[in-house]
Structures are given as structure tokens and as C-alpha cells.
Amino acid sequence: MNTKKVWLVTGCSKGLGNSLVKKLLEKGYPVAATSRNKQSLIEQFGEKSDVFLPVSMNIADESNVKSVVDEVVKKFGHIDVLVNNAGYTYLATIEEINMKDARAMFDVNVFGLLNVTRAVLPIMRKQHHGHIFNVSSLGAYNVGPLSGLYCATKHAVKAISETLAREVSEFGIHVTDVKPG
């Protein structure tokens, strides 16, 4: 029986999430990896196995997120670590930004993170432990031209992380704001 912590990682088709999943699988951790494109996960990491569950998930869709979290718990029995890594950048001046694109970025970078976190928290609270890693950015602290709204999403992630850490510490749940860049 595998006693290693079960990881749920969002945004795994490339970048940080992809590298993290590779390292976790190399070390034998059970991992549920999500992407909007499940096939890309299968091509990179292989088919579903005892320690790997590739899943298509749209983090902006709350009902989709809940069904994926249920699938992960059904397969592995619990979730010990959540890495909220999914997100993207939309660059434009404040004056010229397309509001539809701006809302879509907030839906993924902020509200998607909340959807996944809110779906996983009851599981972690019930088991009296867990660790949530929210990937923000140094952009939460250092803004520049063209990146105002992206940085605003990452500042929101920072604020959510700090607040959540205080709200769930009594349940044995830790929250870390990861700031790559």
C-alpha cells in the first residue's frame, strides 16, 4: 500500500505544473494531474495507473471541478496536497484591454483557484491535514506596463492565500503562496 501523500496539481500540460508532476511521479507519489486537454497529459505522462490519474478539468467550471475532485477521491481515497497552478497571462494596456478577455483571465486565475480550493477543503478538513500551494507571482508585488490586470489576479491569489492560511490552520491545513519569477 502506498503511504505517500496524494497530490492534485492543476495546469499540468506545460511549465511548472508539468515539471512538478514529472518529479512527483519519479519519486512514486500518487498524482492527479489536470489540464484542459487530457490527451496531452497522457502523451507526456502515460495512461491512468495506480499512481497517476490524468484528468481534463476546466477550473472555471465549478461543477466540473467538483466532479473531478470526486473522481480523485474515488481513485486515491483522499487528497493531501493541492497545487493551484493553472493560470495564464493576458497582456495589454489598461486603456486597451478587452474586458471579455480580462474577465476570462480572472475566471481562471482567481475564481478557478477558488473553485478548486473550495472543492478540496472539506476533504482536508475532514482528514485534519493538508497543504495547499497557490501559485501567484512576483507580479503580485512588482507591476509593470501591460501587466496590470495579470498582476491584479496574482495579487488576489496572494490575498486569498494569506487569508485562507489563517482560516484553516486550526484544521491542520497549511497554505503556501508560491511566487515564481
Residue ranges and their predicted role:
Residues 117, 153:
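Active-site helix of classical SDR
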Residues 57-67, 99:
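The beta1-alpha1 cofactor-binding region of Rossmann-like NAD(H)/NADP(H)-dependent oxidoreductases
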Residues 13-14:
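Conserved glycine-rich cofactor-binding loop
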Residues 137:
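Residue(s) in the substrate-gating loop at a strand-loop-helix junction
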Residues 93-94, 101-103:
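Substrate-binding pocket helix/loop in short-chain dehydrogenase/reductase
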Residues 71-84, 90:
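A glycine-rich helix->loop->beta "capping" turn
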Residues 27-42:
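Conserved glycine-rich Rossmann-like NAD(P)H-binding loop of the short-chain dehydrogenase/reductase
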